[in-house]
Amino acid sequence: MYIDYLSLTGFRSYAQLDLELKPGVTVFVGPNGTGKTNIVEAIGYLASLSSHRVSSDAPLVSFDAGQALVRARLVRGSQRTSVELELNPGRSNRARINRANPVRAREILGMCRTVLFAPEDLALVKGDPASRRRFIDELIVSLVPRHAATRSDYERVLKQRNALLKSARAAGRFTSSHEATLEVWDQHMAVAGASLLAARLEALHRLQPHLQSAYRDLTDGSKAARAVYRSTLQGTVNDDGAVVSDANPEELYGLSEPELAERFLAAFAANRRREIERGTSLVGPHRDDLELILGQAPAKGYASHGETWSFALALRLGTYYLLLSDDETPGAGPILILDDVFAELDVQRRSRLAGIVSGAEQVLVTAAVAGDIPEALAGELVTVVPGGISAPAL
């Protein structure tokens, strides 16, 4: 898969940008602040409906624009598809496919597949659990786009249940009315939580061998990398937000969704008093974590800076390997985006990463200095200037 045309209107620093792209490697070069990342951010947003830089859509829309438009023409084998995404801060985003009538933005998920590497990826290893939960949730949607609804359903139920717990806490007592209503939301959250947890477990199971291969490819192979799912069904959350548990995480993989739902109901009952006291849900996928293990030790706190970078890159590269294996149809591979990554890496890691990704159908790279880009990724050079492109703009 590749994009051969991209148009941005009112997106970040671009009042209007029209850009032709080719298969192979394209390198966007320009000083920091000129808008290189804005270009690849738009493509990443088209694929995931989220930004790797901000949590809301508002910053994506130019200050003096009421909305932003991202248009792209996707090429997959002999098929060309035009996709348009309309960003409306404070209102629902809309999309168009081949200029047809508007549909929900979610309808375009899965049409454009990307894997994006960025300096922010260090947070996957060094940061709090929220970064890793976001990673696994992005993965489940990349593999099965309908899981975007699975995630949003859980978030909706969680919001309602938390509101009820907060209300009970504010009232100073837990009434029979609270109990009856909470039991209803327990059922909803158990089912929604089981669906989301099952999707995460399946995705992690599929990612695991590719993560291990990716880490070996990026390093000398002296240490093995793996990820362990830590569920609040099997432990408690400490002050740092991490799940502490001595239980065998593999046990969860053998449970069906109805069995997981029963586990959630039991956990809700066991934590009822604590949840009312705190006015929030203490058990569920929203508090789970991925524990990243390097060799025999947790990567967080024990890995060197170089190892931390290698692990972060391996998570993304492993995702690329998985998506390639998920659909072996010619032309179906994801677009690779490397946003200001090479400036952060030593020469050896630069060389290894470049050698691996150079064979992808389309690779989009940003860099402040062209000299940061390894020779293996020599390709079309596009100079970015404030508000535009010097070449090859239309």
Task: Specify the residue positions occupied by each region the protein language model found.
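Post-Walker A helix-loop "phosphate-sensing" segment adjacent to the P-loop in P-loop NTPases
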Residues: 45-57, 318-327
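Walker B catalytic acidic pair
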Residues: 339-341
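Conserved NTPase motor "head" modules and their coupling/switch loops across ABC/AAA+ ATPases, GTPases
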Residues: 1-31, 174-335, 344-348, 352-355, ...
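Structural recognition of the conserved hydrophobic beta-strand(s) that form the central parallel beta-sheet
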Residues: 72, 362-368
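Nucleotide-state sensing region of NTPase/ATPase domains
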Residues: 47-147, 210-213, 260, 267-273
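A conserved P-loop NTPase coupling/switch region
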Residues: 106-111, 119-191
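Conserved lysine of the Walker
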Residues: 36
